[in-house]
Every structure is written in C-alpha cells, then in structure tokens.
From Swiss-Prot:
Gene this chain is encoded by: hfq
Biological source species: Nitrosomonas eutropha (strain DSM 101675 / C91 / Nm57)
Keyword Electron transport found: no
InterPro entries: Hfq (IPR005001), LSM_dom_sf (IPR010920), Sm (IPR047575)
Function as written in the Swiss-Prot or TrEMBL entry: RNA chaperone that binds small regulatory RNA (sRNAs) and mRNAs to facilitate mRNA translational regulation in response to envelope stress, environmental stress and changes in metabolite concentrations. Also binds with high specificity to tRNAs.
GO MF term set: RNA binding
Protein name, UniProt field: RNA-binding protein Hfq
Length: 80
C-alpha cells in the first residue's frame, strides 16, 4: 500500500485503539468480527474480544466504529 493509504489508515486506527472504541470488522468473505483494536501495523490488526485475533488487512473489507469518531487528517491529504 502506498504512503497515502497509510496517512488515512493510521490516524483512524489509532483513534479507535487509544479511545478503546468497539469496532465491527467485516472481512471480504462476509464474516463479521467484533472487538477492540489492540494494535496494528502495515499488514495486520490485532482485534481483542474474549481472545486476541490477528487479522490481515488484505482480508478486511470494512471497519465500522461503535460510535462516531473524529480523526486528524494531515493537510497533504485534503483536496485542493
């Protein structure tokens, strides 16, 4: 993934992690996972519920926060 993708992903995932916001993660095969984001890197997200699961980002279709979140958007990602 390019740098631009990381500029959007990282702040979004970081807010979800720091604020312990519950999330629903939908995988490309239709499976829904629920929990809290413990950690993430370039390739995986650690999702914690009763157990901790390592979910590969390429398998994720959508991440839905349990409540509205506001993320800091770097100036270079704003349209001109």
């Amino acid at each position: 993934m390019g740098v631009k993708g990381q500029l959007l992903q990282d702040p979004f995932l970081n807010v979800l992690r720091k604020e312990h916001i519950p999330v629903s993660i939908y995988l490309v095969n239709g499976i829904k996972l629920q929990g809290h984001i413990d950690s993430f890197d370039q390739y995986v997200v650690l999702l914690r519920n009763s157990v901790t699961q390592m979910v590969y980002k390429h398998a994720i279709s959508t991440i839905v926060p349990g409540k509205a979140v506001s993320i800091p958007v770097p100036a270079e990602t704003l349209p001109e």
